[in-house]
Amino acid sequence: MSERDDGLGLSLSLSLGFNQKDPSSRLNPMPLASYASSSHMQHMQQSNYNHPQKIQNTWINMFQSSERNSDMRSFLRGIDVNRAPSTVVVDVEDEGAGVSSPNSTVSSVMSGKKSERELMAAAGAVGGGRVEDNEIERASCSLGGGSDDEDGSGNGDDSSRKKLRLSKEQALVLEETFKEHSTLNPKQKMALAKQLNLRTRQVEVWFQNRRARTKLKQTEVDCEYLKRCCENLTDENRRLQKEVSELRALKLSPHLYMHMKPPTTLTMCPSCERVAVTSSSSSVAPPVMNSSSPMGPMSPWAAMPLRQRPAAGSH
């Protein structure tokens, strides 16, 4: 122990405690560390009091040093695989340092795929959707490959999908049967397939195709017929339009009817029962000549002399 008097009435004493006889102080180094830390804090307080501009930097350095010490202690303790997912994220971040685990491997793969998708999306936005088109093409190719594999994995599907080659006799029998019956029931299909040495499915498909061809031909014939009808109706319509235009032209020009003679009428005299021709105009009808009469021309309305008929007994 040492004491010091600076002349101001203050005394400073230091005691290390090595001369004490307590064995617990010798085995426990904590009092020494606590004393050193307390003296360090007193020294910092005095220096901060003398230099207030260094307070902030000192506290920052203390916190940084404490963080580094905690990180070092956690690294020395080791990493537990069975920890919460937060430790998995730490493992992924420290992957470059050589620390690996099953969870870290899975998380790193998933994060790599996610970053790849983000990069592809960004490239697609910049390149005007080219990446999306490429992805669509790859998807379609993959789907097409799957369908090809499925088709090829079937038992006998490729052979059944080949075009059926029929002999002349088989084709003739099928045509004759189709003329009689355009559709067949299952029994007829089985009998015909057995007769022609074919499968029932082949006979059914042939009849389906034959009906489709017949319907197509009938549709073509109907189209031709309707086309001819349309042409005839078009010609008839043109002819009628021409006649209508001619009639309208005659109606708009009435002077063409001035030279036509007025219609004549026939009148009968009630006294003589003779027919006289009269006209609607002011002209007088021409006189009627009587060949049996020695008299000259007479008016048609003049009275005619009546002759007596000879009696039957006068002869």
Curated annotation (Swiss-Prot):
Residues 226-247 are annotated as: Leucine-zipper. Keywords: DNA-binding, Homeobox, Nucleus, Transcription, Transcription regulation. It comes from the Eukaryota. It is found in: Nucleus. Residues 140-163, 280-315 are annotated as: Disordered. One of its GO terms (molecular function) is DNA-binding transcription factor activity, RNA polymerase II-specific. GO terms for cellular component: nucleus. Residues 159-218 bind DNA. Belongs to the HD-ZIP homeobox family. Class II subfamily. Probable transcription factor. This is Homeobox-leucine zipper protein HAT3. It comes from Arabidopsis thaliana (Mouse-ear cress).
